[in-house]
């Protein structure tokens, strides 16, 4: 299946404003998180590709919502601009934030948001603000702890427990992922494809 996945993923385009958002004809799964948390890398891992998702050379410099078509547009992957750090001006950063909020609230074909948290630092206030905003707006999401190979098991357990306690929602799955741990990737991939049906 992995070989098939790579060949049927294609970049559609990047939307930099509300008017350029594509139609809502296909289910969409979005990926969100702080800048440099590894969104594009996770997307590439899930679809078994090294370069399907575009990676910015500078963290915080992705200024558009990137859409990727899967299986001839049977569903789409959506890579949201990172929050928390930006090489844009304050005015531009506000525009991107407004675009993200508009997309998440009004997108009727959005099935799930995967929120990525860097295991090296755990939940930061900006992550909590974003997750709380999702909860307040009744937007379904899962959490993925990234870069777990960069922390020891004790620290990872503490971060996982803290995240579970803070989210306090049995319907929110919390996953752990590392490019070095294959079975972790498989679990997240299975969860990911569950929402494409």
Curated annotation (Swiss-Prot):
One biological process term in Gene Ontology: division septum assembly
Pfam family, one: MMR_HSR1
Family label: Belongs to the TRAFAC class TrmE-Era-EngA-EngB-Septin-like GTPase superfamily. EngB GTPase family.
GO molecular function, one term: GTP binding
Gene name for this UniProt entry: engB
Stretches assigned to the EngB-type G domain: 25-197
Originating species: Wolbachia pipientis subsp. Culex pipiens (strain wPip)
Functional description taken from the UniProt entry: Necessary for normal cell division and for the maintenance of normal septation.
Alphabetical list of PANTHER family matching this protein: ENGB-TYPE G DOMAIN-CONTAINING PROTEIN, MSS1/TRME-RELATED GTP-BINDING PROTEIN
Binding locations of GTP: 33-40, 60-64, 79-82, 146-149, 177-179
InterPro entries attached to this UniProt entry: G_ENGB_dom, GTP-bd, GTP-bd_ribosome_bio_YsxC, P-loop_NTPase
Binding residue positions for Mg(2+): 40, 62
UniProt cofactor(s): Mg(2+)
Record has GTP-binding as a keyword: yes
NCBIfam families listed in its UniProt record: GTPase_YsxC
The protein's name in its UniProt record: Probable GTP-binding protein EngB
Keywords, ordered alphabetically: Cell cycle, Cell division, GTP-binding, Magnesium, Metal-binding, Nucleotide-binding, Septation
């Amino acid at each position: 299946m992995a070989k098939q996945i790579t060949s049927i993923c294609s970049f559609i385009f990047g939307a930099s404003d509300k008017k350029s958002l594509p139609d809502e004809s296909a289910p969409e799964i979005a990926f969100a998180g702080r800048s440099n948390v590894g969104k594009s890398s996770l997307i590439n891992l899930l679809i078994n590709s090294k370069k399907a998702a575009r990676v910015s050379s500078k963290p915080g410099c992705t200024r558009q919502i990137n859409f990727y078509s899967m299986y001839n547009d049977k569903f789409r992957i959506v890579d949201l601009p990172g929050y928390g750090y930006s090489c844009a001006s304050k005015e531009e950063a506000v525009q991107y934030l407004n675009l993200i909020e508009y997309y998440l609230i009004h997108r009727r074909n959005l099935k799930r948001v995967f929120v990525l948290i860097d295991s090296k630092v755990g939940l930061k206030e900006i992550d909590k603000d974003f997750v709380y905003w999702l909860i307040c707006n009744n937007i379904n999401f899962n959490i993925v702890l990234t870069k777990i190979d960069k922390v020891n098991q004790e620290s990872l357990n503490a971060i996982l427990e803290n995240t579970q306690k803070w989210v306090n929602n049995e319907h929110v799955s919390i996953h752990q992922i590392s490019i070095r741990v294959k079975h972790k990737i498989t679990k997240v991939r299975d969860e990911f494809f569950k929402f494409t049906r």
